[in-house]
Amino acid sequence: MAEAFLQVLLDNLTFFIQGELGLVFGFEKEFKKLSSMFSMIQAVLEDAQEKQLKYKAIKNWLQKLNVAAYEVDDILDDCKTEAARFKQAVLGRYHPRTITFCYKVGKRMKEMMEKLDAIAEERRNFHLDERIIERQAARRQTGFVLTEPKVYGREKEEDEIVKILINNVSYSEEVPVLPILGMGGLGKTTLAQMVFNDQRITEHFNLKIWVCVSDDFDEKRLIKAIVESIEGKSLGDMDLAPLQKKLQELLNGKRYFLVLDDVWNEDQEKWDNLRAVLKIGASGASILITTRLEKIGSIMGTLQLYQLSNLSQEDCWLLFKQRAFCHQTETSPKLMEIGKEIVKKCGGVPLAAKTLGGLLRFKREESEWEHVRDSEIWNLPQDENSVLPALRLSYHHLPLDLRQCFAYCAVFPKDTKIEKEYLIALWMAHSFLLSKGNMELEDVGNEVWNELYLRSFFQEIEVKSGKTYFKMHDLIHDLATSMFSASASSRSIRQINVKDDEDMMFIVTNYKDMMSIGFSEVVSSYSPSLFKRFVSLRVLNLSNSEFEQLPSSVGDLVHLRYLDLSGNKICSLPKRLCKLQNLQTLDLYNCQSLSCLPKQTSKLCSLRNLVLDHCPLTSMPPRIGLLTCLKTLGYFVVGERKGYQLGELRNLNLRGAISITHLERVKNDMEAKEANLSAKANLHSLSMSWDRPNRYESEEVKVLEALKPHPNLKYLEIIDFCGFCLPDWMNHSVLKNVVSILISGCENCSCLPPFGELPCLESLELQDGSVEVEYVEDSGFLTRRRFPSLRKLHIGGFCNLKGLQRMKGAEQFPVLEEMKISDCPMFVFPTLSSVKKLEIWGEADAGGLSSISNLSTLTSLKIFSNHTVTSLLEEMFKNLENLIYLSVSFLENLKELPTSLASLNNLKCLDIRYCYALESLPEEGLEGLSSLTELFVEHCNMLKCLPEGLQHLTTLTSLKIRGCPQLIKRCEKGIGEDWHKISHIPNVNIYI
C-alpha cells in the first residue's frame, strides 16, 4: 500500500513547495529534500511489493516506510492547519506562536529525516530494481452499468438440487437439511443463489429466506437475521426469548425454504438450539447450507451431502473470456492462446477465472498477458486453496491507486454489506485517492470502485434509494486482509472498536497513534480530554454510542477527516468542533435531540459531507454557503434572515439528495432563484416541503416555478404545497430522467401535470389531493403511449377521483405491476394487462370493487379497512384466475364472501382478519380452491362454523384460527364438531 500513498504524499509536498508554504515556516529546504527522498524510494516500490511475498526483510522494510510516510503526512497536515490559522489571525513569521510552532515542527522534521535516511540506506541491501511508475490517466465514467454476469457450467447442479428439495418428503419432525460442500471460490454461494431464484422453488415454497452465517454462529444473531429477512426491515435490540417467539410465529405452518450461506460452526449444541426453533414450519419446509467443511455437513445435514465439483475447462474458459474480452467482436488469436494457458492454471475454480479475467480486460499487450501466465506467484507455497495465486496476481497487477483502496476494505468484517459512498468517504479520509485534473475526489473514488467491481473484487451489488451496497467474497476479503496487514503496524489504519472502559484504557496505552477508532457500545465514563491522546486520528466513529455530550477535546483532533455521531442523544455540539479544518465528513444522521449546529460551522472549510437526515433542526447555521467544498447536504431549513436563506445554496456544488423544508419562508420567486437548483447537475434527489401556517398562496406558485431542478434529477418530492397549480417545469424536458415522484398534501391543485409523458418514471405516489381532481390524466384523446416505464402507482386521499384517464387511446401503463389505492371511494379500475399486486384501503363503492375484475393478471390482492361494505359482489373475482394471494382485513360489517371464490383455481393463500360480522365461509366458494395451501382466519367473532367443503381441500397444509371464540370448541382435536373437516391438515393452530 505504501507506493500508492507515497504518490499522494509527493503531491502534497509539491503543493507546499509551489505554494511557498515552506517559506512561511522556513522548511522549504526540508520539504524539497523529503520530496527527493520519497521519489527515489518510490522508484523501487513496484519491485519491493512483488518480492515481499518471498522475503520477510523487504516486507518489514515496507512497513517502516508506511509508518514514516504517514508521520510526514501528519507534519504537512499540521503546517497546513497552522497556516490557515495564521492567515485568519493575521500573524507574522516572528509572532511567538509562529516561532513556537516552527520549533516543534522543526524538531519533528529532524527526527523524520534521520528515519528516512535509515530507510533509504536499508533499501540498498535488497538490490531492488528501479521502475518508472506512470500515473494512470482519468478513467472514463460514461457507459458504466452494473450487470449481473452470466453463470457458466452450473445448470446441471442447479436442476439436481432443486429436484432434491422439491421431491424430498420427510416423515420426521426434523426439517430436512441439504449441505453443499466445496472449497473456497468454487461457487457454492452462486449455486445457492441460482437455486433460491429458481421459479420451481418460488412456486413450491410459501416463504424464502436467505441468511449469511460466516464465522459467527450465534443463535440470537441468526434468529434476528432470519426475522429481518422475512419482514424486510431491521429490528431493534431484542432478547433471545422474544426473538424465538417472533420467529416461530412467522414460520408457523409455513413451508419455508431457508438458505444458511457460508457456515463454519462445528459446535453441535449451537446447531441443535437453532434447529429447535426452526421445527415449527410446515411439512415440506427445507434448509440448504453451504460450507467448506465436511464435518459441518455431518453435524447439520439430514440429506446426503452434495459435493460441488470444479468447473470444466470449457466452462472455466467461457467465464474467463466473458470478463477478459468484455463483448469484443474481434480478439487477438495470440491473446486467446495465452488466455487458455492461464485458465489451465485456475484449476477449474470460478473465482480464479473471473478474477484473472477481470484483471486482463484492462491489458491488451501480449507481454502483459505472458507476465501473468509466467509469474513466480504461481510457484509460491500454497495451502489447500488453489485460488490464492490467481487472487494475489490480480492484486499485484492493480494500478497503484487501486491497491490501497482495495486492501483498506479489510477493515470491514467478513460478509458485511458495505455502502459504496461510505467507503469512498473513508478512502478520502485516509488520503488514498489521487486528484486528477478538475475531477472531484468523489468522482475519482467512484471510478476506483467501478474498476474494482469490473475486476471482480466486489460482488452481490444492490441498489436501494439511490445508494449502492456490495459485499466481498470471503477469499477476496482474506486477500485484502493479508495485503493490508503487510502494510500496517502499530501505526495502524485499522478500525479499532471500543466496547467498554477496559478497551478504552488498553487503546489509550498501546495505540496512541491510531488513525481510526469506533465505539461499538456506550462508554460509561470518559475524561473530557479523552481524544487529545489520539493525535493522529483521522476517522472517529461514535455512532449509536448513547453519547449525550461530545467532549470538547474532539476539537484538538487536527487530522480528523471523518466524524460519525449518528444515532446519539447529543443536544448540541461543542464550539471547538469548528476548529477541525481538515474535517471532510460530519455524520449526524438520526441525532433526534439535536436542534441546531454551532454558529461557526461555516469555518469547517474542508467539509464535503454534512449528513443531517432525521435531525429535528429548527434552523441552519449562518452562512453555510461559505462551505464551498460541500457536496452532500441532506437537509436544509429555510430561514428568513440573510445568511439563512435559500441563496446559501447558490454556489454549493451539491450531489446526492437534499430535503428543503419551510419553503413558506421564501418571500418571492427572486429569492427562490438564488438557490440555483437548475445548475446542480449532480443532485439526484430533491424533496421540497412547506409548513401549513402563514401561507402566501399567491407567491407559492412563482416560488415553486423558480425552484426548477436540473434535468439529471431522478427522485422528486413536493409536500404540502399550497399553490393552485404545479409548475410548468414538471414536463417531459425537465423531468426526463426522473424515476420516482411523490406529490402529497397539494390540496389546492385542481389538476395534475402530464406525468404520462415522463419516459423514465417508474414510481408515482399521489397523496391527499384536491377534491376537483377526477382523473390522474384529464387530457383529450390519447394518441401516444402513456406511462411507458411506470411500475408502481400509489394514490390516496382523492375523494372524487374516478379513474386513471378520462379518455381512452393508445396503450397505457404497459408495465405497471403494483397499485395501491386508498381513500378514493369513487375510483374505478380500467383494463390493465400487467398489474400483479393491488391493495385497496378505505371506502370503495360496489362499482369500484367489481371493477377489480379488469385486472386479469393479478397475483396478489389485499382489501383493507372498508367499514361500509356488507358483501363483495360476485363479479369481483371474475377473470382473476392468476390470483395466488387474497387478504380481506378490517371489513367490519362484511357478513359474507361471494361464491365466485371458487373460480380462483390458483389461489394458494386466503387470509381473513378482523371481519367481526362475518358469519360463515361460502361452502361452494371454498370447494373450488383446488390449489389452496394456507388458510388464516383471525378475529371473526361471529363465525359460527367451518364449511364441509374444507375437508375436500387436499392441498391445504396450514390452518390458523385466532380470536374466533365459537370455533375453538368446534375444532377441538378428536371431539369437536368441525374436527373431521380439518383433521387432514398437517399444521393446525387454534388460538383464543
From Swiss-Prot:
SMART domains: LRR_TYP (SM00369)
Other noteworthy facts: Belongs to a four-gene family located at the same locus. Although the four genes are expressed in the resistant haplotype, only RGA2 confers the resistance to P.infestans. In the susceptible haplotype, RGA1 and RGA3 are likely to be pseudogenes created by deletions and mutations, while RGA2 also contains several modifications.
Record's keyword terms, sorted: ATP-binding, Leucine-rich repeat, Nucleotide-binding, Plant defense, Repeat
Induction section of the entry: Constitutively expressed.
UniProt-listed GO biological process terms: defense response to other organism
Residue stretches of each LRR repeat: 534-556, 557-580, 582-603, 604-628, 646-672, 680-703, 758-783, 787-811, 813-837, 855-879, 881-903, 904-928
GO molecular function, one term: ATP binding
CDD domains: RX-CC_like (cd14798)
Source species, domain of life: Eukaryota
Gene3D superfamilies: 1.20.5.4130, Helical domain of apoptotic protease-activating factors (1.10.8.430), P-loop containing nucleotide triphosphate hydrolases (3.40.50.300), Ribonuclease Inhibitor (3.80.10.10), Winged helix-like DNA-binding domain superfamily/Winged helix DNA-binding domain (1.10.10.10)
Annotated consequence of substituting residue 782 to P: In susceptible haplotype
List of residues binding ATP: 182-189
Organism, scientific name: Solanum bulbocastanum
Name the record gives this protein: Putative disease resistance protein RGA3
Gene (name only): RGA3
Function: Disease resistance protein. Resistance proteins guard the plant against pathogens that contain an appropriate avirulence protein via a direct or indirect interaction with this avirulence protein. That triggers a defense system which restricts the pathogen growth.
Homology family: Belongs to the disease resistance NB-LRR family.
Residue span, NB-ARC domain: 135-437
UniProt cross-references to InterPro entries, sorted A to Z: Apaf_helical, Leu-rich_rpt, Leu-rich_rpt_typical-subtyp, LRR_dom_sf, LRR_R13L1-DRL21, NB-ARC, P-loop_NTPase, RX-like_CC
